[in-house]
């Protein structure tokens, strides 16, 4: 389904509203949701870490888990992600977040153009 007159994609797989941190890629249905994510993910990381630290004092990096949670809160029309150029399910992206908890820092998100099929294949190798 193509983009609507107001610039909304109902099929996230066709969307051109894309952000990436190098490994993970999130797709958005509208420019509004993409900007809402980019404007608020750092604040959400801080709030998420405060909540976790109230429960337990952990040295783990929870940023990616916070970003996935924020993405699912912001994007109301579905959930579509890639990991290193391959489609990733909700469960796979969470497993990735758990694996990255031992890394000292998480990369920041930036807007990218939607990669073409040839670029995806190159990333998969």
Curated annotation (Swiss-Prot):
InterPro entries per UniProt: Phi-29-like_sf, Phi-29_GP4
Residues spanning the signal sequence: none
GO-annotated molecular function: DNA-directed RNA polymerase activity; sigma factor activity
Pfam families according to UniProt: Phi-29_GP4
Domain of life: Viruses
Gene3D superfamilies given in the database record: Phi-29-like late genes activator, P4
Keywords, comma-separated and alphabetical: Activator, DNA-directed RNA polymerase, Early protein, Nucleotidyltransferase, Sigma factor, Transcription, Transcription regulation, Transferase
Any one Gene Ontology cellular component term annotated for this protein: DNA-directed RNA polymerase complex
DNA-binding feature ranges: 77-96
Biological role stated in the UniProt entry: This protein is believed to be a positive regulator of late transcription. It may function as a sigma-like component of the host RNA polymerase. Binds to a region of the A3 promoter located between nucleotides -50 and -100 relative to the transcription start site, that presents a sequence-directed curvature. Full induction of this curvature is needed for the transcription activation process.
Similarity remark: Belongs to the podoviruses GP4 family.
Protein name: Late genes activator
Organism: Bacillus phage B103 (Bacteriophage B103)
Lineage of producing organism: Viruses, Duplodnaviria, Heunggongvirae, Uroviricota, Caudoviricetes
